[in-house]
Amino acid sequence: MAGCLFVAREDLPSEQLALAEPLAAVVAGQRWSRVEPDDVVLVMGAGPIGLLHLQLARHSGARAVVVSEPSAGRRAAAEQLGASVAVEPGDVAAAVEDHSGGVGADAAIVCIGVPGLVGEAIHLVRPGGRVNAFAGFPAGSVAEIDPNAVHYRQVVLTGSANSRRRDYETALRLIEGGHIDTAAMVTHRFGLPDVLDALGKVGADDAIKVAVLP
């Protein structure tokens, strides 16, 4: 059990530290995606996970991060947290072309459980690009993928789930060092007596993370 415990700075609010676990999974996911300095990265979905991927890609030295997201509120949050541009899904191909000089993204990370996005992402990365299916998908989901796009363009397709102890340690250091702004992602705070109101706010267009504080 001791191996599951981590020491964090005492001055960090618990609501910020609560995001260390999903951030650890994001750290693991970007290890598969191999995000490197000067990369152009596409993040599909600007929920909490997408916003963590965005920030970590920036911290890793990505030259540009393009975010695709249908919610106007979450697109605004993505731009506040460092996205080069946050666009509606229908505009993502043009945005990637613009920021990559027509070559395609170096890496695309699917952060929302829409199976069709996996096939779309394959066509949005450059030859030799990387696509990571980070999101979980509904049971029985099927994604249509053009195998020739993978074969001839030598696209690397991976999945990612869970994290290692070292990823959790990295996540804590990133939060403690101020490299990942988890505080900005907690958009609503409720006291324990108002827990039902908090649950009702989850999923709202203007909500990213909702915290219940003692």
Where are the regions that the model predicts?
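C-terminal hydrophobic helical "lid"/dimerization subdomain
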Residues: 119-123, 165-214
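Glycine-rich phosphate-binding loop and adjacent beta-alpha segment
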Residues: 114-177, 214
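Glycine-rich phosphate/adenylate-binding loop and adjacent beta-alpha elements
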Residues: 1-6
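Mid-domain Rossmann-like dinucleotide-binding core that forms the NAD(H)/NADP(H) cofactor-binding site
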Residues: 10-91
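Glycine-centered, small-residue-biased loops immediately flanking beta-strands
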Residues: 39, 129-130, 208
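A generic alpha-to-beta junction signature in SAM-dependent methyltransferases
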Residues: 33-35, 100, 125-126
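Short SAM/SAH-binding signature in class I
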Residues: 103-109, 129-130
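Short amphipathic alpha-helix with an adjacent loop that forms part of the alpha/beta core around
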Residues: 92-102
